[in-house]
Amino acid sequence: MIDFHTHPVLIQEFANKYPNYIEMAREVFQIGNNFQPLETFLLQMDVAGISQAILLPIDCARARNHSVSSNEQVAELCGRSSRFVGFASVDPLKDGAARELEHCVRDLGLKGLKLDPSLQDFRPDDAKAWSVYEVAEALGIPVVVHTGMSWAPRTALESGQPLLLEKAIGRFSKLNFVLAHFAWPWVWEATALSLKYPNVYLDTSC
């Protein structure tokens, strides 16, 4: 079994190594008191019958002053265990986002893209994001997009509405989009997108 949606935010080794790691966990996710060694994380995967985990960072530095793990941290974790598969995250509204994505895939070995319009404070139908989608399509990697409700403070529910992705889904027909969390509470809208477009998949993570 593969856990397709894992945010590596409570790794003790990173809390010890990176000064802002604890602050990030508290500021973005309102957590940060139960850090655990990487070995414990792997043991928990064993207990749950999970063979591999997809690690998803979120580059929300512009909107939140922090990133939910960096691309380099995810690549480091993947180097520590073959049971991890890392995705990259870039902020579509930042200059050089498309080039950064290409670097993450070609140089860091990351295998996909994670976007979170709610935490990153952008609309997924913003044409400024087109260059990022275009590079992802050219690289042949999937993009996981947070859809549905976000519990994080100071986030707009509208940003998680899956229908905001329809223009991009139609325009970039060779790019596979994974709608995270089944877009709850917009489950029917997400279902309709997945039925209409062959490049749309649904992630059932809570």
Please identify what each model-predicted range represents.
Residues 35-45, 69-71, 93-105, 187:
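Short, acidic/polar
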